[in-house]
Amino acid sequence: MARPDAALLDPARYPFAHQITTRFADVDPNQHLNNVALAAMMEDARVRFNLAMGSAVKIGERRAMVASVAMEYLSQGHFPDPVTVHCAVERVGNSSWTVIQLLAQHGRPVAFARSALVAIADDRPTPIAGDYRPVLEQWSLRA
């Protein structure tokens, strides 16, 4: 994945933000926040974003499954300062949607992630429910 477009690095464009306390255990031998710890922070924020959208584990008879996650590490993050993960829906398709996330510390971009989520029923992709599509669009990236 190439470095994200500069417009995607503006926290004001994201409708959801979640602050995470960093832990000493998140630090690696290079004295910065470990890449695996950053991925876990993105995961935590993505789940909280889904909950904020009102989509717990099930969406009616459908479930949402993560199909892919791609992450770019943009700069170093450091303990003990907290990080903020900003989340938005980037795209809504027929049976899937894309969530983008910006992890920042002191307003400085540290990491960017793009995740594809798929609506699943009977272990197969299924169209996004009609009443859920407006919810996804409401949480879209701001212009």
Segments predicted by a language model, with ranges:
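A short, contiguous structural element within a folded domain that forms the immediate neighborhood
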Residues: 49-59, 64
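HotDog/MaoC-like acyl-thioester-processing domains
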Residues: 1-18, 73, 77-79, 90-143
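Small beta-barrel nucleic-acid-binding modules, principally OB-folds
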Residues: 60-78
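Catalytic strand-loop segment that frames the active site of acyl-thioester-processing enzymes
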Residues: 2-48, 52
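Amphipathic, hydrophobic secondary-structure cores in small proteins
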Residues: 27-30, 65, 91
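A broad, structural micro-motif
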Residues: 33, 64-66, 110
